[in-house]
């Protein structure tokens, strides 16, 4: 059977009837003649011509991208969907991506405008001059307190020449006239790499270093100090000036401040293994908790048993973080000692820290969970504060914050501790009040721990305190002579912190701006009297020999003496009197010598000495190094055997404390600042050595170097200066040996020999050298005082004004 193939033109079979084929062709011809009927040769479906008069599709169909039958008033699609059918306008289809991009661009533009406005506002605030009352005198000239020619401006208050008003070192009165110095800063605004600014005030470590930078810059570019041969020689030698300018450019704190970003892994806080906690517990109690008594030994042991037996959910996170912090603090202390003694445990201890710090990151990322008013939160926050300052990439929680994180985190945790303490009512007395320090309840003990930590934070950041003794009904207690030695040391230390509160309020706070010269001098005299009363009260404690079985307490005794020396520096540096300025060099030098004595030989350092050394650098402002460095620059003594060597040794001892894995830690940044100071001293010393070889430096007769050639003081000046505080220290080497860098042959048994007088007390020139001058009677007005105290020579003893506040004295002596 033969298949039929269709005709391509007509689609009819080839063997079809011819008559039918002809009829088909005729129909095709007729259709081709008509333009309205498309040809069947086109395979596409014929389309009708659109009606130009028809309306466009409705908006709903256009949005849904479906065919619209354009029926009025409602198309069939909208009728079935029961939605409004709108033919009013024909909107364009919205590009969602483009719309989001435009919206984001608008937000970015607004943020740029806000950022520019904030930057301009910061500049205006820095340049803005404080308003003056109509009755306030307008000074005619403003001195620069950060770089004046006289040594007094290094550490004293700011005083306009035509006014007697006296200001604190960190707050300056800017003249309203046009000839004022616009470069005088109101504190140091620090820019952070993550954005934002923060004010660091005097005497924060960064503020001290920037103060030295401003002082050197001023002397190199503007004013040469009058009477300073050092800077006159440098100004005359372009090569020397270029060397100092190059060293000045190496200042390490000129850029943005790098604060680590705390990132949590959003996992719950984990409990550390109990065996690691038990291994660390003894070291924590003996070397950390003994100075900062956060926990009672027995109660801490019971808490450990309860937590690991029940793992209660109520306070589980708080105790888990507390135990983690105890391990971190102990492991960090062991790691420092291991590095110094070249032990094989170095890598093991260092490798353990990051894993434990993850728990701290989780806690710091959500700090609010530990702000509920309860004692355990106070304790855990205290342990976290300790770690923040030493390792800033991280007292227990506050202690950890101080060790491993930045200063901003440290201050944040400190403020959280004080807030929880006030919410818990630690500053209020509860129950019967005991007058003995050794019978103090737990709540009161925790209050004093938080109180002392708050005073340390105030001087380390220059910011006001959060807890004040006048706002608390808890007062100092007396500690009996038969109380345990650590309790007596702790009581003396807390007593000194109450004096620190008065020092900050009267000399370093914003309130001190309103004080006149006479008021400021009176405040200095009162605080100096309070320090001498403290010295008299605790002289036996400072001079007590340490038994061999209590050898770990000897560094704590040295720390208490160091605290007393730093306190003297903090007071005397605010006095413009020249004799007072000369006097306070001795406690500054003695403070650095105490650091050297605690550090000793690094290869034989112990856990107790290392813990005390860390507290010396961490808990106290580094004003001694700053002021001795300033004296070297002012007086032209950068190569003096004593001051320059002490600064170099202090930096060497600081290298024991910082970790290479945490370059942004407090100790690491502090070491960088001290390195810049020592490099600057070495540069000046090198310039003077070359100048001495060339014959441009030194006395005309060539008998001695110009650095030590001075006019001897008159007998009246010598009689007004109290005895050298060095005589009160029984350090294991003599003063001459220390100045020459010699090592002692036989260490002394006690830290203070009973034959020496108390700090700051004058002794009689006749008779037994151990009898203070006030005991000799005669014309000494101090005989009428009880307890007797040494009166500074510049203080008129016959003045009708009291030497110190009677109410404050009665409260601290009760």
From Swiss-Prot:
Looking at the UniProt feature table, which residue ranges are given for the DNA-binding region? 58-85
InterPro entries in the cross-refs: AtrR-like, Transcription_factor_dom_fun, Zn2-C6_fun-type_DNA-bd_sf, Zn2Cys6_DnaBD
GO terms under cellular component: nucleus
Keyword Amino-acid biosynthesis listed? The answer is no
Pfam families under this entry?
A: Fungal_trans (PF04082), Zn_clus (PF00172)
Which CDD domains does this one have?
fungal_TF_MHR, GAL4
Q: Which GO terms describe its molecular function?
A: DNA binding; DNA-binding transcription factor activity, RNA polymerase II-specific; zinc ion binding
Q: Where in the cell is it found?
A: Nucleus
Polar residues bias spans: 16-27, 49-59
Which PROSITE patterns does the entry link to? Answer: ZN2_CY6_FUNGAL_1, ZN2_CY6_FUNGAL_2
Segments forming a coiled coil = none
Gene3D superfamilies registered for this protein in UniProt: Zn(2)-C6 fungal-type DNA-binding domain (4.10.240.10)
- Which keywords, in A-to-Z order, does the entry hold? DNA-binding, Metal-binding, Nucleus, Transcription, Transcription regulation, Zinc
- Location of region: Disordered: 1-59, 699-723
Keyword Membrane attached: no
Q: Which GO terms describe its biological process?
A: DNA-templated transcription; positive regulation of metabolic process
Task: Give start-end positions of Low complexity composition bias.
Answer: 713-723
- Where's it mainly located? nucleus
Q: What is its biological role?
A: Transcription factor that regulates the expression of the gene cluster that mediates the biosynthesis of oryzines, natural products with an unusual maleidride backbone.
Under what name is this protein listed? Transcription factor oryO
What is the source species?
Aspergillus oryzae (strain ATCC 42149 / RIB 40) (Yellow koji mold)
